[in-house]
């Protein structure tokens, strides 16, 4: 891809290099170049067929193991002429999970398509010396384009001639203000936002008129570079997917190891080969929580609904949990931390500093100047014009001091003068009014106005005014100076009378400081990345609590000097990055991730898209966000507010906590089943049938597991900085201990029950009672999992009404299974009632004992892993 340094070349050089001139290309030459360079559109990633996408859903160890189990079960059922129910149920589970995953993947981003929509428009070009309108996809290097206010720039181009040209480049740079452009020569190296003689594809012309020569099209444009980044970015697994994959791998390896041991032991004992195979299949069914994928999918769907109520729209389901695992939130400034509305905040006039709330008297000339030096139009409550002028217009309107003054002439703002002036008539007298930067205005003033009296401007007075500007600028205010003349108005910008200052800013959202404080208490680092100046970025960051000193801020220029290894260390100490390009933003995200952080990135412009896609969770803006960003993002903020991100993190942490409870609930029971199936092989007795295990895993376990998703947040959820720390595993020491130790104890108890009733009655009765025990245990254990650390034996044990109802329904279904004709598939008939009561009684005793020993677990084992990285 070409390095675009056309801004360093003079127009004449470009004419020669591009073999063109002011009359444009000939139609013949344009056709040749179209064939050489191709259409002016972005390349697209080769798409996979739906069939291939669906097949990829089976590329998982756990799924493969289940398929093998189903196939072997079907073969044995065929040989032994038995029912295929087990095989069919397993395959149905596999297909349902694959279908859900397929639907999710089909929602994948279409960002490149959205970028290409920016090229579906028309532009006016000069060809053969004549103006014509063509499809922008036919534009080639060397074309001369005419641009006017409202036009979409379709290629990177050098300005030949312009008049009051302003371009909004926020899609590329993040700079919210329109940039003034002109045909100037630039010899030194400049950042994208400093290239005043260029216009770029994907940007909008907001004011003025220009002729430009096209230098780059399609993938060679700055927009094309962003498109290339989007195509090159790999869709990495989310934290949740990594954690679930780890569970799959661990379970698969354990199952394979145990099956091998079972086969060896069984063959050494000269057991029937088909019996060994059936036990192996039973083991696979017992070990794999078949319903886990479906349950997690349902939980995440419920989480998506809850987040939507809090103005967070989740596009990619796994991102629900990722948001709760976030370590660092990289936020844009404009519109997210701030309101994205410039507002007048300070007024300096008559030697006094006022706020926008004050009612100020005796300032007619000040009001005349403000009313005159703006070009805002209002249409159906919509304000059109430069954002600073809109802020002034609204201020005048709110104070009811907007004055309609006849205008004779206007001297538009330009980057050399840094001023705009108007000639107006007031009561038959001609005035000139000027608005601009303090440097430019004050150096052209000879007098200042105070209480309708004129005074000579002295050096001391200038120092005083510059001091006021410095103090106000430190508050993130943009300061403009005002002046006027009543004599020699044909030369309006010299020998003027200084009136005062007006300060404007895009203020922080009221909710942001509290939200940032909540993040800090939660161990989440806030990083602000903006296209604005370092001074503005620092001031806003200080005002909302992101940084306390200037040392926490840096610029894109400084970052670009660092190697990747140096940047990896540098990102640990900076919280504010100003004047950041898309490529630098991508490097910052990569550096943060290389330190082991889970990174959330917000953005609204096309320039943000690569970094949003690269981040662990990309957050797009619902109001100001481009369609490109919305397609790339994992979630979208309906109201664009930073505090909404924190609401999303809070909800994500609740869901993460509940998923841990569900993992405990499902795996603890499955490990018990694995141990008992293995023991049954050693004892040469069948404790469980495959159908019983499927019933427990799919029916008894699934509904309570889903209902655990409705557990409410805990009071310390956003204060607990370590328990929610991201690891590639759910298995904290506490969770592992509860699963393993608990499973061993439960297996011993159940083995004793089995042996006792095998002697007291028979093996089949003992197996049936074991089935009843395990079902009862799973229902009681669902209540225990509501709180991993503390006992649930209190008045709140039934406070999760959905869980209570779910358990009650399963209990009813279980009773129906035991007393109707279908019971023959699960238990032997005519079991003595006292056997059942003894079994259930033991289960309740074990449940109570399990709750009583929870404090011992909590004391001995941590609910987090030690982490090395620091925030």
Residues covered by each model-derived region:
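Conserved cytosolic headpiece of P-type ATPases
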Residues: 1-719, 728-731, 756, 771, ...
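Core segments of transmembrane alpha-helices
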Residues: 669-673, 738-750
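Membrane-helix interface and helix-disruption motif detector
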Residues: 688, 758-765
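Generic alpha-helical transmembrane segments
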Residues: 700, 704-705, 746, 768-782
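Membrane-water interface at loop-to-transmembrane-helix junctions
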Residues: 724-744, 764-769
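A C-terminal functional module that forms or caps the active site or interfaces directly
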Residues: 785
């Amino acid at each position: 891809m070409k390095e675009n340094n056309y801004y360093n070349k003079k127009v004449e050089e470009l004419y020669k290099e591009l073999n063109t001139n002011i009359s444009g290309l000939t139609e013949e030459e344009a056709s040749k170049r179209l064939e050489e360079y191709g259409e002016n559109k972005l390349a697209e990633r080769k798409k996979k067929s739906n069939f291939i996408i669906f097949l990829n859903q089976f590329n998982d160890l756990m799924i493969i193991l289940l398929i093998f189990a189903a196939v072997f079960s079907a073969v044995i059922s065929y040989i032994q002429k038995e029912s295929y129910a087990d095989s069919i149920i397993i395959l149905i589970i596999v297909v349902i999970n694959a279908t859900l995953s397929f639907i999710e993947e089909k929602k994948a981003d279409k960002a490149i398509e959205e970028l290409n929509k920016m090229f579906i428009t028309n532009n006016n070009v000069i060809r053969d010396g004549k103006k014509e309108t063509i499809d922008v996809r036919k534009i080639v290097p060397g074309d001369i384009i005419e641009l006017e206010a409202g036009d979409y720039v379709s290629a990177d181009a050098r300005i030949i001639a312009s008049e009051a040209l302003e371009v909004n480049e926020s899609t590329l740079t993040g700079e919210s203000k329109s940039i003034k452009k002109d045909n100037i020569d630039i010899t030194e190296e400049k950042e994208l936002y400093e290239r005043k003689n260029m216009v770029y594809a994907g940007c909008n012309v907001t004011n003025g008129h220009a002729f430009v020569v096209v230098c780059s099209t399609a993938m060679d444009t700055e927009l094309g570079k962003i498109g290339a980044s989007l195509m090159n970015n790999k869709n990495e697994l989310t934290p949740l997917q990594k954690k679930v994959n780890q569970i799959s791998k661990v379970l698969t390896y354990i199952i394979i190891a145990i099956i091998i041991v079972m086969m060896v032991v069984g063959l050494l004992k000269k057991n029937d080969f088909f019996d060994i195979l059936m036990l192996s299949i039973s083991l696979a069914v017992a070990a794999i929580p078949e319903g886990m994928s479906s349950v997690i999918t349902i939980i995440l769907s419920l989480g998506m609904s809850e987040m939507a109520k809090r103005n967070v729209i989740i596009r990619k389901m796994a991102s629900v949990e990722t948001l709760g695992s976030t370590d660092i939130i990289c936020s844009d400034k404009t519109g997210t931390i701030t309101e994205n509305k410039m507002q007048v905040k300070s007024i300096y006039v008559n030697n006094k500093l006022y706020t926008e709330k004050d009612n100020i008297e005796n300032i007619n000339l000040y009001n005349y100047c403000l009313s005159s030096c703006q070009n805002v139009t209002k249409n159906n409550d919509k304000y059109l014009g430069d954002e600073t002028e809109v802020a002034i217009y609204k201020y005048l309107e709110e104070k009811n001091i907007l004055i309609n003054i006849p205008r004779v002439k206007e001297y538009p703002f330009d980057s050399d003068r840094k001023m705009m002036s108007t000639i107006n008539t007031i009561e038959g007298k001609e005035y000139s009014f000027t608005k601009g930067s303090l440097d430019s205005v004050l150096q052209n003033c000879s007098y200042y106005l105070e209480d309708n009296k004129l005074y000579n401007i002295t050096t001391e007075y200038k120092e005083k005014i510059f001091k006021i500007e410095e103090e106000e600028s430190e508050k993130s205010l943009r300061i403009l100076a005002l002046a006027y003349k009543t004599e020699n108005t044909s030369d309006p910008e010299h020998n003027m009378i200084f009136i005062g200052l007006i300060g404007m800013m895009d203020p922080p959202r009221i909710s942001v400081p509290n939200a940032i404080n909540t993040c800090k208490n939660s161990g989440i680092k806030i990083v602000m990345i903006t296209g604005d100046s370092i001074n503005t970025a620092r001031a806003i960051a200080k005002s909302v609590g992101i940084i306390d000193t200037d040392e926490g801020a840096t610029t894109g220029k400084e970052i670009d000097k660092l190697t990747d290894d140096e940047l990896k260390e540098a990102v640990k100490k900076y919280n504010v990055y100003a004047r950041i390009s898309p490529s630098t933003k991508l490097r910052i995200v990569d550096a943060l991730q290389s330190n082991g952080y889970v990174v959330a990135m917000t953005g609204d412009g096309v320039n943000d898209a690569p970094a949003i896609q690269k981040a662990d969770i990309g957050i797009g803006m619902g109001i100001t966000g481009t369609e490109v960003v919305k397609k790339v993002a994992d979630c979208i903020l309906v109201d664009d507010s930073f505090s909404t991100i924190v609401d999303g993190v809070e909800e994500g942490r609740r869901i993460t906590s509940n998923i841990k409870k569900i993992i405990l609930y499902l795996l603890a029971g499955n490990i018990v089943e694995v141990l008992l199936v293995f023991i049954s092989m050693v004892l040469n007795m069948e404790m469980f049938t495959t159908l019983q295990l499927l019933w427990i895993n799919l029916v008894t376990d699934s509904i309570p597991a889903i209902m655990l998703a409705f557990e409410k947040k805990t009071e310390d959820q956003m204060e607990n900085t370590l328990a929610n720390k991201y690891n590639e595993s759910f298995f904290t020491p506490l969770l592992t201990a509860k699963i393993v130790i608990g499973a061993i104890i439960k297996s011993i108890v159940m083995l004793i029950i089995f042996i006792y009733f095998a002697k007291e009655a028979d093996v089949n009765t003992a197996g049936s009672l074991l089935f009843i025990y395990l079902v009862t245990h799973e229902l009681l254990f669902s209540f225990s999992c509501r709180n991993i650390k503390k006992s649930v034996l209190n008045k709140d044990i039934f406070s999760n009404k959905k869980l209570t109802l779910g358990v009650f329904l399963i209990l009813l279904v279980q009773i129906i299974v035991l007393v109707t004709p279908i019971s023959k598939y699960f238990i032997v008939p005519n079991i003595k009632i006292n056997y059942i009561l003894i079994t259930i009684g033991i289960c309740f005793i074990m449940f109570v004992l399990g709750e009583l020993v929870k404090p011992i677990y909590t004391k001995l084992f941590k609910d987090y892993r030690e982490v090395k990285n620091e925030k």
